[in-house]
Amino acid sequence: MSKCILCGSAENLTEEHIFPDALGGCVVLANGTCATCNSTASTQFEAEFINGFAIVRQLLGIENREGKVPSLKATVEIEGQAHVATIKPEGKIEIPPMKIERQDEAGRKEIIYRTFKKGDAEKIIEKAKSKGIELENAPIADLAREVDAVVHVSLDFIGRQSGLRTAAKAAYAALALKTGVGYALSGTFDTVRNYCRNGGTPTPARLFLNDNFQASFHIGPHQHAIVCAGDAKTKRTHALVIYFGNLFYYVRVSDTYEGADFNWTMACDAQRDEEVKFIVGEYDNEFLMLEDIASGNTHWDDIKASGDYLMRNFSKALGLKFE
């Protein structure tokens, strides 16, 4: 009988995406979570993680469950004033009507409305008329204008509970897919399972950077991956969870593992919505890779450094500019 990997319920089971569906995750654990746990995870941490990657999702053309690529909130400068704008998935910039206040030569206050979309001017005029205000129509030359749209991105979420719990849940769900739900629900994995459900500290998931790993493991900015290994001698099961090729999490899945040794890697292509069967790396196996992270020269829990590394490599791969 299928059961929820988080609470053990056999009622109202739903698909569990190993990597979030809205981030292009295509690997699925059928009947993996109940509707309640699925909804709770989305509300408590996954939604913030997914929404934080809106700019990456738009640039890669990754659709959500409704088949829509996200639009982006941006800032443009027009006539010396900052104004909000929206960047649509196809690259078009939509600017809502803007209100400019200034003084004329006689010291009188002028209010000027600028519109950028057909129909907006008429709506402003009609609204003013309803208030008994007559607006003067002052047409300007129909000139094409170039504006720079600036998108402000905060990556703090990658080191908060939203990022850490999403990574831990991905590692745990992948383990359940590979080893079976019944085994994943055993006491061996209580710690990581309880963290996925309830959060809190200490966390089994951590951000990391490691020069040797970064030089030896190669996937694209459109790919996600999980590397996992269980070692009976050390009683440790641990995993690496990698988003967009350049954001790295280390997850302690269990410190009481006593089963047979195992190691595996799974990956998916977020742009193509398909599982990746072959990953390029210079490690002999997953055991060595994970031990290199756990025991080597690893830089831990640095949100800024991890965020800078992600966006620097993402921009380089796509030929973009990030500051």
Language-model-detected regions and their locations in the chain:
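Alpha-helical structural context detector biased toward long hydrophobic helices
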Residues: 2, 24-323
